[in-house]
Regions:
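Generic beta-sheet signal
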Residues: 4, 96-105
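Domain-level recognition of soluble alpha/beta enzyme cores
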Residues: 121-153
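Short, glycine/charged-enriched secondary-structure capping and boundary segments
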Residues: 19-22, 65-69, 88-90, 116-120, ...
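Active-site-proximal alpha-helix that buttresses catalytic centers in soluble enzyme cores
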Residues: 2-3, 7-78, 82, 110, ...
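Functional cleft and adjacent loop/helix regions within the main domain
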Residues: 80-82, 142, 147-164
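Non-DNA-binding regulatory cores of transcription-related proteins
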Residues: 94-97, 107-128
Length: 164
């Protein structure tokens, strides 16, 4: 079994209109939500073997709350700059020794991945939400369209009652 956990970056700031989209940091709510989601995942899911992360500031800041010293951490330019096909290629090239992979990324690519892998259309993939997809294969190169199932999901608003 292989597990791909998709995590959208936490809420980002739009306070500085002159800031390039790539450089936008997390806002107050994002900095509040990301560690809470991270704590929840540490209870619910095993630690990943590999984290793949967009190089955008908000994705990197979010991933920082989830990283540990034992997990391989890789920044992949394609997660921010390219579309679904290029991200699928990254996933298919993952070493099979990494059976539990977390990917920190952006919309609409994350929703498109859920639909591609499971056939399920998400109405929304909220900030800092988590969707884990499991595949009954041994190699990442063997995953195909609609070959996975959602095995876990977490939406921050479902368990975080107070917002800063």
């Amino acid at each position: 079994m292989l597990y791909l956990t998709l995590i959208r970056h936490a809420k980002s700031s739009w306070d500085n209109p002159s800031l390039d989209d790539f450089e936008r940091p997390l806002n107050k709510r994002g900095l509040y939500t990301a560690p809470l989601v991270s704590q929840k995942l540490k209870i619910k899911l095993p630690s990943p073997d590999l984290i793949l992360c967009s190089p955008a500031k908000r994705a990197m800041q979010t991933a920082d709350f989830f990283k540990n010293n034992k997990t391989i951490f890789e920044i992949k330019q394609n997660i921010y700059f390219d579309g679904l096909d290029e991200i699928l290629e990254i996933i298919r090239q993952i070493n099979p020794s990494c059976s539990n992979v977390w990917l920190f990324g952006h919309e609409p690519n994350l929703s498109e991945m859920v639909e591609f892998f499971t056939g399920k259309i998400l109405a929304k993939f909220p900030t800092c939400a988590v969707f884990q997809i499991c595949f009954s294969v041994e190699k990442w190169s063997e995953i195909e369209k609609e070959s996975g199932k959602i095995s876990f999901s977490l939406i921050p608003k479902d368990f975080i009652l107070q917002k800063p």
